[in-house]
Amino acid sequence: MVQNAEYGSGVEITRLEGKGNGRGDLELTYASEQDILDNTIASTVTYTAGHGPVDIRVVDPIRVPDAEFELRLAGDDADLEDAIDAYWTLTNETMLSDDDPDNDYKAVHESSTSIALLNEELLLDWGLSVTLHQYAYPEDGKFTEPVHASITFDDSSKPWFVGIPDQEGFSELNWIRAGNQEGADDVPSEVIFNDLKTGNPLDEDEVYEGILGGTWAPYCLVSYTGDVELPTGEVVSLPNIAPTVDGLEGDLSPFSGISGLNNVDVVLTSNKDLWTRCPVLEMQSVHELAQDEDGDDGTNTRPEKLTLRHHPSVDKNGRYAGQSGYEGPGNQPMGMGWFPGYAIDVGTGERLNMAFGEDSWLGADNGDDMLWNPSPNIYGGVGGGFGGGGGGSAIYAGGQHWIYVFKNSQYEEGTENRMPAYDEGAYLYENLEVSGSTTNVRRVFRACTWVGSSLLNDGFELLSIEDGLIPNDARIRLRVAKAYEKYSPTNVDAEDNYDGATNFWNPLYTFSTKDIAAVPMQDTVLTSVLDEINVVPNPYYAFSQYETSKLDNRIKITNLPEVCTIRIYNLQGTLVRQFSKADPLTSVDWDLKNERNVPIAGGVYIIHVEVPGIGDKTLKWFGIMRPTDLDNF
């Protein structure tokens, strides 16, 4: 048999129903990501080998069959939270569908333990193992653990995008409120900077302060701008540099805390066909400084922080209605723009709504043009924001181009009057427009899961808006542990309505071992195997890593089939050494001696490998011999 997988190799897994990943680091295949971008919601999604919601691995490559499998979790209307009663069932569909009735009972395997227990189940007849362990949310269900976070660039030598690292203490740049910093309740400024604000989700161990170097965080942990009365009696809004405002901070519902986080990819791209229609939010907290270009009758209607920018909506080239060449929709006249990229929930297979911010007072840092184009400046000129920093300079935070990612909350809240999957920003616009009520605004931000800070790396420049802004596509991956649960990509009421369900909307997966199955040693296979035969090291310069002593000379002829004959000749055609191999080892050691056990001379040798009934392979090898070491005599 010829193996097509290694021990520990994973398999591509397709999710049909349900959601959850345990502690798995999910990664979609290219085809699944394109399906989501084309259709907003994918009915099925496929994950790359080793990055699926279930850990399925090869443990015996020779035994892996060419088969199609189905994996069901709790194949009835069971409560997956009560994991002690939930089991999984793996079915070899290929074996089940053959004509041998004796295979029917062999084709189905039920887990020997419930998913409440961490167990790697060995399926030795199929050369596989399955690990499926239900995740239990800590802190009475209010917390989940981060699994992985990364940022990658198509051109890794040009990391143009960075963020604003979180700082500690009473500083405007302490924008992630994790830890145990507790301010005095009677000092307003300390209340604003309090990590332990009443009602907020707790992250006392600060595990979420380190996401990508403290540049991304859960929305429920970010800092907020609030009114503070100074000793002079003046009331000011502090801190100015913050992603949200008092009243919209923290966990706004049972679904918006840390345990409600989702697994997302945020992609920045110059491909305008993939850009996201979204609101542009005003980030200037001083009402009188915010830009007002809404073309009204002259009354002062300057926007409050975290509301729609008072600026005409722009198209993908930054033009607005009335300007030559404008190509934008006409039904969202104010405050809408385009984020140069997209966000995907890799756990549910949905494209997500987004928003980004701008501080319209910071025009020099691109804060007033309705484009996501952060500057490289954390600090500005001489002045100084609350908390100081930067040698007394004011904090500009790149123009405050915060990135907001919103999950589809319709399913978990059980109503269609909640944030949907990507709808070109329609839900966000309807609920955030100037006349939007406080209830509507809270409804929006209770669906916000992740916030990213934005800063252009020193020494880099963005492209022009006409060329797509992004100089080098970047991908941010944010992964957390999620419990397995019911889910339907098309049915909001999946808890009670099973129409169209195969497994009661509980997790249901399929995978194939066709590409990794062991195959018989057919002639065509072995012929290709001949191409892999090699000799190492080549050339040999007096030493090799395979030698065990000063008197040892050794090279290896590698990637050999089980049965073959190896003949080694000098350039005069004289046979120097012959090996007859008939064992499962894949290499033969040559001690650089002839048949009479005499060390060979340096030079070029011809190595001929003959595989009976298949073919042969000829290699040239060059070696330089070292003098015999007589120190040991």
Task: Identify the residue ranges that each predicted region occupies.
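Hydrophobic beta-strand segments within extracellular beta-sandwich modules
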Residues: 602-603, 607
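Polybasic, low-complexity Lys/Arg-rich tracts in intrinsically disordered regions
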Residues: 2-570, 576-596, 608-610, 616, ...
